Amino acid sequence: MKRSAFFISDGTGITAETLGQSLLAQFENITFNKFTRPYIDSVEKARAMVQQINNAADKDDVRPIIFDTIVNQDIREILATSNGFMIDIFSTFLAPLEQELSSHSSYSVGKSHSIGHNSNYMERIEAVNFALDNDDGARTHYYDKADIILVGVSRCGKTPTCLYMAMQFGIRAANYPLTEDDMERLQLPAALKQHREKLFGLTIDPDRLTAIRHERKPNSRYSSYAQCEFEVREVESLFRRENIAHINSTHFSVEEISAKVLVEKGVERRFK
């Protein structure tokens, strides 16, 4: 079964898309064609949006699902004339919250993502720069400033996880790829030993690792199943021997991996 889903906002669309994606993910038996439409901030754009929604309804022969975070009442009323099932995120959550807090919300566009009013902005940038500068074991002499150091075989998800933690939570995360030489020594590399308390391991199913590496270096020893299986087995053995907490990243999203890492290591988010 297929349905169209629209994430519509008069701002960036981040809130509508994030919440909408989370809700739609609960319906695994349905395939959704997803469309993000940010900055629908005028009557003309709203009318054009209605036409897009109606076209999707005609094509699918079923009304689309619409997640919106539109602040302007006139624009919301225009969207409501479309042949779609609307979920107005702001009105759904703000109305009961206003009642509980005995206060009216500001209904401001892009409030949570404003750079000018976000005291965490520079800290976020610094964390991202740290993750980039300390990616792939590039600069181990800065590990004393890291909150977390992810370790694991090449292409198991270390870099995207570090960047996500930096962007979302201001975590200074470094990562170090364990190589075949490290495995042959049967011990942690010298650069990691003095930061053992910051280490967290990522592992991955060999067949998934093979597929990922094949996209980068097809038909190579690096991407062969035998090599991937060997590296994963040896690294998992190293994690157990050195008592390093670790998880298998195969079936988890970057968001889930990040949350598990922070909980396991007891690291507090710099901002929430």
Curated annotation (Swiss-Prot):
Which reaction is this enzyme known to catalyze? [pyruvate, water dikinase] + ADP = [pyruvate, water dikinase]-phosphate + AMP + H(+); [pyruvate, water dikinase]-phosphate + phosphate + H(+) = [pyruvate, water dikinase] + diphosphate
Binding residue positions for ADP: 152-159
Q: One Pfam family, please name it.
A: Kinase-PPPase
Q: Which GO terms describe its molecular function?
A: ADP binding; ATP binding; phosphotransferase activity, phosphate group as acceptor; protein serine/threonine kinase activity
Q: Does the keyword Ribonucleoprotein apply?
A: no
Which keywords has UniProt assigned to this entry? Kinase, Nucleotide-binding, Serine/threonine-protein kinase, Transferase
Q: What is its EC number?
A: 2.7.11.33, 2.7.4.28
Family designation: Belongs to the pyruvate, phosphate/water dikinase regulatory protein family. PSRP subfamily.
Family matches, as NCBIfam families: PRK05339.1
Biological role stated in the UniProt entry:
Bifunctional serine/threonine kinase and phosphorylase involved in the regulation of the phosphoenolpyruvate synthase (PEPS) by catalyzing its phosphorylation/dephosphorylation.
| Protein name from the UniProt record | Putative phosphoenolpyruvate synthase regulatory protein
Q: What is the native source organism of this protein?
A: Pseudomonas syringae pv. syringae (strain B728a)
